[in-house]
Amino acid sequence: MAGRDITEGRANQAIAVDVGIVSTSAYWQNTSDSYDVALGGQPFFYAISDARPYIRQTAPYNKDKFDNSPEPGEQSLTGWWLRSQSSFHSGSGIKFYDPSAGETVSHRFTDSKNVNVWTKGQATLLKDVATGHVTTYPVESNGRSFQQLRSIKWGSNDGVLLHDGYDVDKIDTTGVETHFIDYNAGADDKVYAICDDGTTAYWVTNDTGPSGKLEVNKKVLTADSTTSATPMFTINGVTVTNATMEYVKDRIVMAANNKIYEFPTSQATAPTALYTHSDDDIIFTSITASGPAIYIAGYSGIQSSIFKFTLNTAGVMPTLTSAITAAEMPVGEKIHKIYYYLGYMMIGTNKGIRAAVVSDQDGSINYGPLIVETTQPCYDFAARDRFVWCATSVAGEPGVIRIDLGNEIETLRFAYANDIYYTGVSGVETTSCAFLGETDRLAFCTEAINQKSVTNKERTTTTATITSAAHGFVAGDVIYVIGVDAALDGNWTITSVTTNTITFTTTTSGTIASTAVTNAFVGKPGYSYLEAASTLASTGYITTGYIRYGTLEPKNFKRLLARGDFSYGSLILETVDKDGVEYDHITYEAGVTAVEVTTSSPSTAQEYVAYKFVFNRDATTTSQGPVFKGYQAKATIATPRQRTMQFPVYCFDIETDRYNVVSGYEGKAFARLQLLEDVEENGDVVAWQDLTTGENRQVVIEEISFTRMTPPDKRFDGFGGIIEITIRTV
């Protein structure tokens, strides 16, 4: 006799649960039974009463917290997420501003121009910059710069000595130039290197006589180009193609071609090379000295090293058959400048700037990572107080970067930021920097570019035309002409061009028609630039790091407040979104109270934003501008709020729906409870259906509480009761 089929149920009641394991993502569809709610595909009847209400509320989204931030008020107990910054003295170089990351982020920002950030607790405009003397020599094909600025003082005049290829000029604090060496590009050779001991300048060139031999000259700094130089010595059989020289430790050290010489300032005969490098093609670039040693940097191809020469007990550099290699750069990184200051050696390369610690015992050096990667080589350094200025350009425009050796962010990585620069010029490299004598005013210079040979010259009255194949200039360009003709050499504005000719108008008149001499050139000039004595830059800015509050969730950035003194000039507050789009909010200036502003743009929630503060100097008192002391931003989390719902359901073997339809079987209650607890233990997301309203949500089960009660029918085993279920939407 066949037994009863399980689907027949008991007491003619159908099975109310699925056979097998129920999927947590399953949905329930009412058929003959009108269930009220389903969770993970399991249906239940509500057991709602005054004693057991259905509760629905917003899930907590702010955790309990206390204020332990280094910036007061950084934690919010009022619903706002706060971010504030009261100083910028640790420099630029971060992308995200998360102060919890420590000193590598605290008091730093992303970018700035024309802003002095080095006073703790405030930021102000830097000084303005004006153009000075033109430069007419480009960077050499081997990568060497033939511009060099040196701080000098002659008589009562503070200024700089500008070496520019064939010429050397003195420039004072007012920008007035005095020709010091005036070699003719068509008749003389260039100045390959120059140094001074504070009163006299020394330089190396080639004697243009038949032998073309190396020649070292000197001249007191109070002289000018009308004063003849004093030849110190010549070296027969040596023609200079590359050189660097420096006055260190009461002597001149000179590297010419692949040989290194040492001689006193009174030298009158050719010295003997104390070291000859095995590579004839090596390019020596820079010389400096620490307490126990003298260093010379150079590169050959894509390999670059620093060579060390230690002094013996008599204070004499020993003659070496091989130099001591103190440091080697990574392949492809070439050293252009080394500069010893405050116990560190600054290293300028084609990749950027490094610092090395120097042993005061044996002069050994240990260099660190790149402090900053630059868009051009770092050709030069200048120093005052705890700061070092670096000739690197500022975002492709003529200018310098400043490094604070008193603020070490990481091992041998120091705080840095853009410093003074000249806006509106691009495509040139900043090649040198120096202070104007004893002042705190900086000068820097740029290379000339697009230098082309001139093969012919002619002039009718004041209209001059020179021939230069495929020159690439256009009408309106300012050019320099050197070595062509005394009447045509100088700086001119082009009036017209053809593919191979350039026409301009001269200040004198006369007829000229002849082939140009050898070493005649035309090009686009560079300039020297002088920092102003008191006038501030007209505008500047600071852009903060992106603020994301340490989470990737979207936020509503809604409030911004800046603090400072805005009696002079103005400060504009802007938001910068992730795509770099800027949104103006308010301008603080005299007569406008610095109030907290609503930042309604961008209008949508953002994962992160930055803030940009634009400084404008005072229109009347140009030596004054805004003093910015910090900001505070407020945001709220934009993540959709979650809801918790708590409701009771029946869990008995036999149950009746609202239409008195009975369903169930013996053991059903315990089986359903176990299935529900299994889903809870997995922590998975399940489908919740309110079958009375049609609402469907994805939820997680927060809590299940089962209360066992007396079953309505004593025929059953007695297991059953009320389940209190708490869920949270996701």
Q: Which residue stretches match the model-derived regions?
A:
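Non-cytosolic beta-sandwich-type ligand-binding/adhesion modules
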Residues: 2-50, 218-221, 263, 309-311, ...
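N-terminal beta-propeller domains
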Residues: 2-225, 229, 249-251, 255-277, ...
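Repeated scaffold domains used in trafficking and secretory/extracellular systems
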Residues: 106-108, 138-155, 185-198, 234-250, ...
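Short Trp-Ser/Thr-centered turn/loop motifs at beta-strand boundaries
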Residues: 230, 235, 277, 531-552, ...
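Loop/turn-rich, solvent-exposed surfaces of beta-rich toroidal or solenoidal domains
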Residues: 375-408, 430-432, 559
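Extracellular/virion structural assembly segments
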Residues: 398, 635-730
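Blade-level signature of beta-propeller repeat domains, shared across WD40, Kelch, NHL, RCC1
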Residues: 432-449, 523-538
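Small/polar beta-strand repeat architecture
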Residues: 450-523
